[in-house]
Structure formats: C-alpha cells, structure tokens
Amino acid sequence: MAKDLNVFDKEYGLLINGEWTKGSEGKLLSSYNPANGDELAKFTDATDADVDAAVVAAQEAFKTWRKTTTAERAAILNKIADVIDENAELFALQETLDNGKPIRETRAADVPLASDHFRYFASVIRGEEGTATQLDAEDLSIVLREPIGVVGQIIPWNFPFLMAAWKIAPALAAGCTIVIHPSSSTSLSLLSFAQKINHLLPKGVLNVITGRGSKSGEYMLHHKGFNKLAFTGSTEVGRRVGIAAAELLIPSTLELGGKSANIFFDDMPFDKALEGAQKGILFNQGQVCCAGSRIFIQEGIYDKFVNALAEEFKKIKVGLPWEDDTQMGSQVNAGQLETILKYVKIGEQEGCRIITGGKKIEGELGKGEFVEPTLIEAGSNEARVAQEEIFGPVATVIKFKTEEEVIKMANDSEYGLGGAVWSTDINRCLRVSNALETGRVWVNCYNRLPAGAPFGGYKTSGIGRETHKMMLAAYTQVKNIYISTREEREGFY
C-alpha cells in the first residue's frame, strides 16, 4: 500500500501575536521534496515590517509571560511534549519529506528527542533556585535569575524540528518570548508544529517568521528589539551573528560547524566500532555539525577496518526517504549535493584515494539529490577534505601509530564540536577524551544526543551549551538584591 504523502497545507502564513497572517506583502516561496523535486507547499516570504510586528508582539507578551510561575510554564512544556507524542508519525513524515532524511531516523531520533527536550526543561525549571547569602551580621545578598526578554532564534535546515525544540524549550522555560526563523529550505515542519501548539501559549509568546535568510533573517540580526540571539548553522554565518549581537550589546548562543575526529584504536570493540563509524558520518546523510568526518584508525587494525567499512558503505540502502527500509536519504538541496561532489574532486586533485562512492546516484533516484556514501583515504590530515567541513556522507580515513600522534592530528583543526574514542581500555579513553579540544567526546558510541548532556563547541564551533539545564542561564540574567538591616547611619558622610 502506497504511503499518503499529502501531509502539508497548500500554503502557510506567519505566526505573529497568536494569529496566522499572510504577511505585509503576501509574497510566497516554495518548499520542495529533495528526493524527487516535487513542490510540497508554499510559505510566506516575510518582510522587515513582518519582523517588526513579531518583535512588538513578543515584547508585549513578555510583560505577562515573564510573571508566570515555573509550575505554569512547566505544565505548558509538558503539554507541548504531549502534542509531539500524539502527532509523532505526522511530524516524522513531514520532516522526512521536507529535509530528505530517512523516516527511520525521524521516528527514532528527531521527533522523540524533541519531545524529550520539552519534558526535560519542564522538569529542571521547577528545580531552579536563587540564593541568599548572609554576608555579615547586618548585610544579606539575594541572587535571582530573571528572564532575559525577547529572543531571536535562527535554526538550520539539517534538523529543523529538533533544533526548534532545542531553542524553544529552554527559552519558554526561562520565561522568555520568542521570534524564531527557520531555514527557507526546510520551514514546513516548524510551521506545522506551531499550528499544533499555538493554542497552548498566550498570544505573542511564540512567533514564527519564514522567508529568505538573506532578507528577513538578516534583518533579525540587527533588530534592536531583541535581548538575545541564538543561532545554529555554519561558522561563517555564526561569526556574523556574533558580530551583530556584539554591536547590539546583547548575548548570543552559537552552535556552529565541525570537523570531528572519530578515533579507533587497535583494541576497539570491532563490530560496534564499525557501526559507529557509519553512524558518525552517514546519519542524516552526513549533514550533521558534529559528524565524525575524520576517521583516524590505528595502524595495526587499519587495513582490516578500512576494508570492512568500505564494504558496509557499499551495502547502505540509499533510497526514497519515506520508505521504511531506506538507510540513507537525499541531501537537502542541489546546492549541497554540488558542494559534496566538488570536495570529492578536490580530494582527487590533492592525490587522495576514493575508496568507495563519490558519485551522484542516477537511475530511479536521478530526480533527487542523492549521492553515494563516500570513503576517502586522505593520506594527510592537512588535506582540504580532512580540514574543511563538507557536510555530507563523506569521510576521510587517516592512519596513526600512537596515542600522542592521533591527539595532535585530532586537535589540528579550527573546529572543536564533537569527537569519539573507541577502545576497550577505559584509561586510554579517558586520557584521550581529556586531551581532545572539543566540546563533546563520545566513548564507544556516536551521535547520541539526549537532553541532559550539554552540547556545544570549542574554538570556531560555537559559544555556549545547549540540551542541558545550564542553557537556562543563557536565557536569564542575574539580579542581586543587597539588603542592609542596619538601622543607624553608616557615618560615611
């Protein structure tokens, strides 16, 4: 029985002040299924005036939302999680169609993890406490955390549903109001989600602006109505977001690019490690900021592991992403596919060996943006394919001899987002983990991203941490109330 793929409205507007509007000019953009090129739906191309209206709505809503209790906000977050659970199959299919990732991934990861994040922040916000310190016999210091205000959030195209949850859940929990902007490549799942939860929130608490990043997204960066910016995307754009926030003298949270090292020692758990190497680079077609795109293999097991990994790559079922048995779907758009193929050519020009893959898939999948899982023997960690973020199912394999050598190579990168160590020697795992200059190190696993474990980067991979209660601090500001109980004059004047 064919699966019904008609799961979107024909057109989507903007969510401003609790109402759906076509925007000030009513111009529309189209979203396409990257697996076959079919148009999925149209959505509004917002103007500067639309962003202004959304910010004003958020500012007005903040006056009352900030006064809600943590219990009230926690109850709403749990209700949002209930909506996700009740519509899990719908959201999974919508994310798959709009993004191109396999439905087995959206069912197992994107959607349930989104629900998990709302429940997590509903829980931890109830435990947040201020402090009171008796400084001396007469002076008392009270420290409170208050919501920072209106936050502008910009989310990427690789995990639009999950990244929305990563941004929205802690901001709402902290008592902030939101103007959120998805990528123009993948706006539909957030719009559908907003439709389902709009009735749970007071007007203006959550506002959704869609359109071109170069237009409405750029305007958001410089808007004086925001008290904080939060961005997930490339390091190149992240720099501009950070500069814009600095010019406004407001804080920013930036989750940016990566070129993560997936390190395999001779004593690795072989079969599990083989799967971990695949999960590190093939999950979401390699379009993951923390993808394990640099695979370092110790010399004693190098040939055996590379040969086995190449065979596993060849067996991957690349197919229509909505089919249950598909293991790898399509890239998000033609531009991303072109970038991947460009880097394969760069690798060849540098003298790297293409072990397997490296070509666009034609035939039955020729209408979509499909590429073969690709394994490249880089020879040197200095090769461009080993240093620059490709953002696709392309991994470089590099041989190493010693622990010290691989640590040096792993850290020889401008990025520092993720990484992994595979070994049955726990002391080695801890030594190497401590030595890696990266915000997340997995040990004998990869791409596990539950709420409760902080995620974020070192170096040019970002500023701040998400998926953890410490994110509440990023959406709040500290107030100190200093009380003197002394009744007499101090005698200073």
Put a short name on every predicted segment.
Residues 39-46, 60-67, 153, 262-265, ...:
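Short, well-ordered beta-strand elements within core beta-sheets of diverse protein domains
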Residues 129-272, 400:
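Rossmann-like NAD(P) dinucleotide-binding subdomain of oxidoreductase/dehydrogenase enzymes
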Residues 1-34:
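Hydrophobic face of amphipathic alpha-helices that form TPR/SEL1-like repeat modules
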Residues 37, 73, 95, 118, ...:
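Residue-level signal for inorganic ion chemistry
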Residues 36-42, 263, 317, 349, ...:
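Conserved C-terminal structural/oligomerization subdomain of aldehyde/semialdehyde dehydrogenase
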Residues 38-128, 138:
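Glycine-rich loop-to-alpha-helix module at the N-terminal edge of alpha/beta enzyme cores
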Residues 236-380, 443, 490-492:
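ALDH superfamily catalytic-core signature
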Residues 62, 66, 81-88, 92, ...:
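Structural signal for hydrophobic packing residues in well-ordered secondary-structure cores
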